[in-house]
Amino acid sequence: MKLIRTEDAVGQVLCHDITQIIPGQFKGARFRKGHIVQPEDIPVLLSIGKENLYVWEKRPGILHEDEAAALLYKAAAGRNIHGTEPKEGKIELVADCDGLLKIDRAALLAVNRTPQMMIAAIHGDLPVKKGQKLAGTRIIPLVIEQEKMDAMQAAAGSEPILNVLPFHPKNFAVITTGSEVFKGRIEDKFTPILVGKLAEYGCEMTYHKTCDDDPAGITAAILEAKAAGCELIFTTGGMSVDPDDRTPLAIKNTGAEIITYGAPVLPGAMFLVSYLDGVPVCGLPGCVMYAKRTIFDLLLPRLLADDPITAEDIARLGEGGLCLGCAECHWPNCGFGHC
């Protein structure tokens, strides 16, 4: 840094905060470290006794924090994400659309293990809204060597660390199972719950059928729904270990690839996810009907963003997989589903 007269500081970058005190009104930083001095700032600086200033001296191979933040932003921001203007050395990443936030956790860790820089993000694999803040980038010092930023870019890799996958409204099917509903002994209260949850994402139910506990009938209904063009197929009921619960067998008999039957999530341990020629077929346990949030809420955004679900993905849900059933639900702004 170098010391210059305040009148000569226009366009220069401050190396430290400058405090202003107005008795009875204000005491705090009037100008922050990293601020670029403007012509209108000169009278203010002089009025608070700053005849001289320490400013950053541009040197080859040394980057200012705003320049470094821009490089971090470039490494981090992918599809459907834009950045704010640099402010105090920080750039924030913002979602351009409603969708699913995906984070390359290994790349994020690699960047944050690089000395003197950071990217702080919200949790991935959860729904985000257009305009929502996703992450922030900055370096720790005011200036940094170009070679350190080169090391960061090498650690980050060639692909963006964060992407937002847009949601795609889909036609879906609900196949209600259980002799108690099929024979009219109780009302189907499951289907309206699903219709409501899917409507939040602009989806429409285009197929619905009620079956008894005969696996062959459930299998036929699933295949019929797929032939009708349904892009998501949900079966309700029949997912436990009771002898009359045959829905998992029915799904298997369609020829679908079973990704997992069972998940380390409560509520939602008896969940089943499979793919039938690329179409998701999910067996939903009864908790989806009565619990505020379940594994269904964790995975539905991924299904609507066409993000393939693997057995490892399900296994990872064990950390953060316990819903506390709070009196006032704040999901996804809570620990449920965060791993």
What does each model-found stretch correspond to?
Residues E7-G11, A29, G83-P86, L126-V128, ...:
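Solvent-exposed alpha-helices and their adjacent loops that cap or buttress functional pockets
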Residues S179, K189, T206-G335:
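Short glycine/threonine-rich loop/turn motifs
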Residues R59-F167:
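Extended, charged alpha/beta regions that create polyanion-binding interfaces
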Residues M1-E88:
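Short, low-complexity N-terminal leaders and the immediately following helix N-cap/first helix
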Residues R32, Q38, P43, H123, ...:
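Residue-level recognition of short, solvent-exposed, well-ordered loop/turn junctions
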Residues A29, K33, E85, L100-M118, ...:
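C-terminal terminal segments
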Residues S158-D213, G217:
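Glycine-rich phosphate/diphosphate-binding loop of Rossmann-like nucleotide-binding domains
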Residues V55-W56, I81-P86, I144-Q146, E204-H208, ...:
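Flexible, glycine/charged-enriched surface loops at secondary-structure junctions
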